[in-house]
From Swiss-Prot:
Gene: rpsO
Subunit structure: Part of the 30S ribosomal subunit. Forms a bridge to the 50S subunit in the 70S ribosome, contacting the 23S rRNA.
Keyword Ribonucleoprotein attached: yes
Example GO BP: translation
One Pfam family from the record: Ribosomal_S15
Similarity comment: family membership: Belongs to the universal ribosomal protein uS15 family.
Protein name, entry field: Small ribosomal subunit protein uS15
The entry's keywords: Ribonucleoprotein, Ribosomal protein, RNA-binding, rRNA-binding
Gene Ontology cellular-component annotations: cytosolic small ribosomal subunit
Function: One of the primary rRNA binding proteins, it binds directly to 16S rRNA where it helps nucleate assembly of the platform of the 30S subunit by binding and bridging several RNA helices of the 16S rRNA. Forms an intersubunit bridge (bridge B4) with the 23S rRNA of the 50S subunit in the ribosome.
Length: 89
């Protein structure tokens, strides 16, 4: 369940710290959050799709590690990101 280029570009534009920013933790977490939301909706319909469920858990773990990194580096950026994404951490 990959995102199309337009969806990624929209997310990058919203969460980028500078022009052309594709690799900052904020952008990565935002893209992962969108993919997680899409996979969650898929799994509501296809309850027995265990391969996608494993992929979802891997994405959640990757997002958690990135959020831990941001939290250790700059707590204010972390709090801002959590608030903007609407996450419960």
């Amino acid at each position: 369940m990959a995102l199309d280029q337009q969806a990624k570009a929209k997310i990058r534009a919203e969460y980028a710290t500078v022009e052309g920013d594709t690799g900052s933790p904020e952008v990565q977490v935002a893209v992962l959050t969108k993919r997680i939301a899409d996979l969650t909706e898929h799994l509501k319909v296809h309850k027995h799709d265990h391969h996608s469920r494993r992929g979802l858990l891997l994405l959640v773990g990757r997002r958690r590690r990135l959020l831990n990194y941001v939290q250790k580096r700059d707590i204010n950026r972390y709090r801002s990101l959590i608030e903007r994404l609407g996450l419960r951490r």
